[in-house]
């Protein structure tokens, strides 16, 4: 008998394995007292106890095999609202099935922010019994087709109940399906079980579930007189309690039962280059199932974020940067536009550089010395290529003579004390090169940025570069500065967990030099344990960039911001091109701006809500110009203690306790 049972279980597993991911509940062992004793915990017993009492915790098996004594250790009190121990029991019955169904018709229940148990009892009928039940139903409707007196006196009044005729036809179709054994029929009893120690809170939960079920076209009732029977009928193995059991077929059953679970993400960072058991990037809220967000899929953490302006992109980028600091020896390099990352950077002790802008705090303006590092052959080769780019940007056609002259001068400067651009110009022999580089020396408009004797950039673990002013300076000034910054960042990538955040990436996707650099980063930075996060509000620029296929393939994680125009012609095609289906586009279109985000990875997809509190929003969501001006003033006045005063200004009078400040 045991052999037959095990074979039957194995066959069921094999049948389900084709479409479902199932795992057998087992008894596991755990060593105690340094290995002197072994404790046994049974998952099946734990699940059955959860069904009965609503308490989900490990159940340790006793040494004596009297396991049933550990299942029901709570008292059940009958009534309109039954009680198990000190917790009230609520039952929501699903009835009034709609005329048609589709897969996952009740998946919206997954979004409810509460704990419940959904029981779907189905009592199978064999083919002959199902045909008999359906035949009785057919005869009942057949009798209603013609009026009673027409049937009694065998007359034809031409009065026909067309609804009854339709039901007869549908019943005959059901009989044909049962006879062909394409589907099986049975009695279906769905109920949702809730527990709560507060009666009013339980009633509110039950009413919320009832409203959601009714919104999907079903009927639903909160059980009262039938509550105890419905609860008992929901327990595993109980087939006789609860008389509410409509007859449906297995095709409808497959649509109604919850076959899919909500993707909760990995509790640990999936990247093998991170320390073992590193936590996920963040845990956020969404319905009753927490969501653990990770940028990485295996060892690739490149992420594409896109959505319209004003939908919460800057807040998301700031939160990603803040959460990334949880990893040991992490490095964060962010290219910001609009100073949205200023509050977080200063609060975290990072460096915030406003490149090309006026220094708001009266300090010496930032200036670079790109030729300061010429120690290795690779450094000198890069310097020569960088000088060549500057000359080409001024409209000079580069010839071999130009390259030889520039390379020769870079080599000479490697052993010289002066390494500014002015030193290079004074030493190079060709007049065309001198004239082209004049624009970038102290005598030209860009000398303030690129012609320093000593580099003012000291890169630490958290660096933010505000490039809004730089972006307005034109291509000839923008390209050299960003190319140099990219070079400095690349040299710091030593295998530590790193992330490069590019806000308003459409500005860079529109330039061939940066397109090539982004393409290169997406292909090679994975080996340096660095993730690239590209955020853009211009979907059309991303599509016209020429590397949309590279973005799609190299960025396995895509985070979409709410976009009410996602279903409109033109925008829809972009979402479809990067692999989104009709349902996903609908989710993006209906999501709440500045609150909900839709993440898609090869491992799953999820609409989530970051549910940020007021303290977090004070640093990742304070991007208004008035807020930024106050923060700059507070930082200038109080230095490292400015966050306390900032929070106090926003109504947190006990802010000092958050920072352990007396």
UniProtKB/Swiss-Prot annotation:
A molecular function (GO) term: ATP binding
Task: List the SMART domains.
Answer: AAA
Q: Which Pfam families match?
A: CagE_TrbE_VirB
Please give the start and end residues of each transmembrane region.
Answer: none
Determine if Secreted is one of this entry's keywords. Answer: no
Which residues does the record give as ATP binding sites? 307-314
Do you know which InterPro entries this protein is assigned to? AAA+_ATPase, CagE_TrbE_VirB_cntrl_dom, P-loop_NTPase, T4SS_component
| Keywords linked to the UniProt accession | ATP-binding, Conjugation, Nucleotide-binding, Plasmid
Family under the similarity heading: Belongs to the TrbE/VirB4 family.
Which protein is depicted? Probable conjugal transfer protein TrbE part 2
Gene giving rise to this polypeptide: trbEB
